[in-house]
């Protein structure tokens, strides 16, 4: 392979490594759950970990059911899920 081809391959591999998201395999299971507002009708502001965007975000929790990917503060979300 020519040196130009090797440089192109190296550049593509570097770009791929930079753009590939960090694996979520090391995240606690609750952080992989989708946000789940539940069926009730309260309008409570909570935080959840968005495992696609790799960050904590707000959502409105209905006040019942839902799942464990629900935190009162962004600090609690980050300390549990943020990498």
Swiss-Prot record:
Residues 1-24 form the signal peptide. InterPro entries: Kunitz_BPTI, Kunitz_BPTI_sf, Prtase_inh_Kunz-CS, TFPI/VKTCI-like. The keyword Chaperone does not apply. GO terms for molecular function: serine-type endopeptidase inhibitor activity. Keywords: Disulfide bond, Protease inhibitor, Secreted, Serine protease inhibitor, Signal. One of its GO terms (cellular component) is extracellular space. It comes from the Eukaryota. The keyword Secreted applies. The record marks 41-42 as: Reactive bond for trypsin. PANTHER family: BPTI_KUNITZ INHIBITOR DOMAIN-CONTAINING PROTEIN, KUNITZ-TYPE PROTEASE INHIBITOR-RELATED. Belongs to the venom Kunitz-type family. Serine protease inhibitor. This is Kunitz-type serine protease inhibitor vestiginin-3. The lineage of its organism: Eukaryota, Metazoa, Chordata, Craniata, Vertebrata.
